[in-house]
């Protein structure tokens, strides 16, 4: 299936050759623990204007899937453009044990390829920390921290393109206990003026409508609203710094909602994710129903930057 999905994803875009001075920036916005509960994707009880606007300006993929519904395995796959089982990275956080995992000979993380091509490479959380602390990596193999130049692309040389990743907490914002969820929803009330009431939550049919589950889903929808707000801030940074018009933005999550039948499960709720790609050379307002995988963003990003796709990349 990977050959089919990569062809479908690349076939959407016009990958005309570009000069070094015209090379686009590439920004991946990767969100934790969130399914496609955005207004542009489905009927939801919240508004997501920034995600919707990004989708309207680019391509919205309606059948995008991750190859693993847990973060470290998923991230190990998309940072290399390889199935996790092909590189020995399929056990969750196996790289944290006493026995370290190395990538097979010749396999390289995509930031190394961008950096080698002259790109300034960054990875950060949001807001970007002034101390240049890197954002979430969570790879199940040993990697060279030097493949990242820092956390903020604003520190690059003049006219130098950047390859950046911004890692957002997404569904994790709501916390893991009733107390942390309540604190989070109080902060939502302060920011938005109201929290999502349980009365508007429509649960999937396989969930019992108990107070615990309804409250958690209401908090989850608030985390979706918050993620949408943060995306708006990220896009504003691009516009303020004059980079928006020359930046390809990839918006995706690392797996579905953290709930039974979601995160860690191979049900659709765990592996189906939103995927939106927008930027120069990409016509807006398009939707695709082709089945694509999250590892497809890796060769696609290289192609859109007019960089060679390694033969080993899946």
Describe each model-derived feature in a short phrase.
Residues 1-2:
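N-terminal secretory signal peptides that target proteins for export/translocation
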Residues 5-16:
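Bacterial N-terminal signal peptides
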Residues 19-21, 151-158:
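Short amphipathic alpha-helices and their capping/turn segments at secondary-structure boundaries
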Residues 22-27, 57-62, 116-122, 158-163, ...:
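Loop/turn elements at helix/coil->beta-strand transitions in domains of secreted/extracellular proteins
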Residues 27-31, 253:
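Hydrophobic residues in beta-strands of the RecA-like P-loop NTPase core, especially within AAA+ ATPase
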Residues 28, 35-108, 113-119:
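Active-site segment of extracytoplasmic enzymes that catalyze sulfate/phosphate-ester chemistry
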Residues 36-46, 69, 92, 98, ...:
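Active-site-proximal cap/lid insertion segments
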Residues 60-66, 123-126, 313-314:
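Conserved S-adenosyl-L-methionine
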């Amino acid at each position: 299936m990977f050959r089919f999905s990569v062809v479908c994803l690349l076939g959407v875009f016009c990958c005309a050759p570009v000069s070094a001075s015209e090379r686009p920036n590439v920004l991946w916005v990767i969100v934790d623990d969130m399914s496609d509960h955005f207004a542009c994707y489905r009927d939801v009880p919240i508004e997501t204007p920034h995600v919707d606007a990004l989708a309207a300006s680019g391509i919205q993929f309606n059948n995008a899937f991750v190859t693993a519904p847990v973060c470290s395995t998923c991230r190990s796959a998309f940072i290399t453009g390889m199935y996790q089982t092909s590189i020995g990275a399929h056990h969750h956080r196996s790289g944290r044990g006493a026995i370290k995992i190395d990538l097979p000979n010749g396999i390289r993380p995509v930031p190394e390829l961008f950096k080698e091509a002259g790109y300034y490479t960054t990875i950060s959380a949001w807001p970007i920390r002034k101390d240049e602390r890197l954002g979430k990596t969570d790879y199940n193999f040993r990697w060279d921290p030097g493949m990242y130049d820092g956390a903020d692309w604003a520190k690059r040389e003049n006219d130098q393109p950047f390859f950046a990743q911004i890692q957002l907490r997404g569904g994790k914002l709501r916390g893991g206990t009733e107390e942390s969820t309540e604190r989070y929803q109080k902060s939502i009330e302060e920011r938005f003026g109201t929290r999502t009431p349980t009365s508007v939550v429509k649960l999937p049919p396989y969930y019992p409508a108990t107070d615990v589950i309804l409250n958690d889903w209401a908090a989850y929808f608030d985390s979706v609203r918050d993620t949408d707000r943060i995306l708006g801030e990220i896009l504003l940074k691009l516009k303020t710094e004059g980079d928006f018009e020359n930046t390809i933005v990839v918006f995706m999550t690392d797996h579905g909602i953290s709930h039974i039948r979601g995160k860690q499960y191979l049900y659709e709720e765990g592996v189906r994710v939103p995927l939106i790609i927008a930027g120069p050379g990409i016509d807006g307002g398009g939707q695709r129903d082709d089945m694509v995988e999250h590892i497809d963003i890796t060769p696609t990003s290289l192609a859109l930057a007019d960089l060679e796709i390694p033969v080993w990349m899946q």
